[in-house]
């Protein structure tokens, strides 16, 4: 499974502006898990630069994507991805961390 397949499995589709941003950031976090500690200083600006948009746009569209996932996904699968039971909507950083970690556990380190 890759990042795109995972997002689609979580009820997120390619019509959301944040979809491509999320795929890009998940790949960055898979390569460097510590990147989630620099979400506003590294991940958002790097993603914004890559897509030619503002950091604020990346953050806002990620929030929408995470909210969509929270309201549309199969919660049991979302908990499996997170590795724990989620009682509330994850933050953007937590979402990126848990999806990248899930993909690493699935044997997709690249």
Language-model region placement:
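C-terminal engagement/docking regions of AAA+ P-loop ATPases
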Residues: 51, 60-63, 67-110
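Short alpha-helical "recognition helix" segments of helix-turn-helix
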Residues: 47-48
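Histone-fold modules and their flanking histone-like tails across chromatin and transcription assemblies
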Residues: 1-42, 90-110
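Helical mechanochemical/support elements of P-loop NTPase systems and associated helical scaffolds
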Residues: 18, 58-61
């Amino acid at each position: 499974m890759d990042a795109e397949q995972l997002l689609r499995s979580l009820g997120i589709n390619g019509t959301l502006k944040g979809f491509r941003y999320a795929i890009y950031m998940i790949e960055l976090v898979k390569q460097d898990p510590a990147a989630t500690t620099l979400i506003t200083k590294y991940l958002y600006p790097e993603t914004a630069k890559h897509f030619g948009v503002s950091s604020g746009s990346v953050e806002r569209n990620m929030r929408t994507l995470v909210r969509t996932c929270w309201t549309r996904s199969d919660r049991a699968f979302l908990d499996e991805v997170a590795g724990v039971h989620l009682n509330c909507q994850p933050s953007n950083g937590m979402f990126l961390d848990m999806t990248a970690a899930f993909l690493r556990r699935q044997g997709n380190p690249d």
